[in-house]
Amino acid sequence: MSHRLQTDTHFTDKTRELLQKMPDFVRRYIRSIHNATSARTQYEYLKDIQQYFRWLSQTTPTENITLELLAEQTKEDFEDYLEYIEHYEDENQKQRTNGRTSIKRKLSSLRKFFAWLFANDYLPSDEIRKITIPKIAKKEIIHMEETEVKDFLNSIQKGENLTKRQMGYHQKQSIRDMAIACLMLSTGIRVSECAELDVTDVDMQHSCIHITRKGGDESTVYFSDEASAYLQTWLEQRAGMKIPDSETALFLSSRKKRLSVRSIEILIAKYAKRAIPGKHITPHKLRSTFATSLYQETGDIYLVAETLGHKDITTTKEHYAKLSDSRKRDNRNKIKLLSQ
């Protein structure tokens, strides 16, 4: 069974377990989004609904929440809930907090749920729609400059600026780490997408990988000739390792297990810290480095959006607005009027 299928099965089982403690109309809602969302997304939506139900009636089991009770909720009630989840005590008496980004996501989940209830005549109105979605301050896109990319890759390839202890580990894993870094820098894939890759997802003949995006959409992403060379070397090294037939992962840990998202984050940070001190580089910064370079080379924001897997080009435009303005400013004298 592929890792992707294992993940889907895991979240499907968790969703079914949660649904046993939910009223029938929630089960119908989850069923309605089954074909349009991933198993992970369905589970996350359900967790957000469950949390809201627990707050709504703390003495009533979630499966006994009624449509009549939901119909009584006002805009002010929803505002009270959003204020509550900023800082609260969970069912295990642990203190929990949520930042603006998390609150925005939870509100989005509930808005979708209540919109469905209203559209399907379960509720007479959609009060939560009156809630203003919290605005999140836009962060400046941090990316590596061309010289920094070279320093970063040299750190991986040659072990430059590493400690003696790190060098011992580096000699065993440098081929794998170089393949990971080059693949991410030449495709812009997310760290989760990289960690989930199986060997069968790699098509060396056509220089592409097959990935599943957030939301469950499948996509084909092409990598560069440089990345291809390092991937080929890693695949040859992997083929010579004693690995159980059941292990399908492309990238493996020293224990011959699938390399986790956290492990990739740590190895990227390790090399970047030595090569580019003072600049906080994460796998997501590799993604933004790729996107910045692609936009600077092509000027095609639609290509960048499609390659990154953004469903809404507005997201891409917002992130790379400064680059777009700079490009327009640089081209202001391209059209000549009187002078030739």
Give residue spans per PLM region:
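Conserved catalytic core of the tyrosine transesterase superfamily
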Residues: M1-Q340
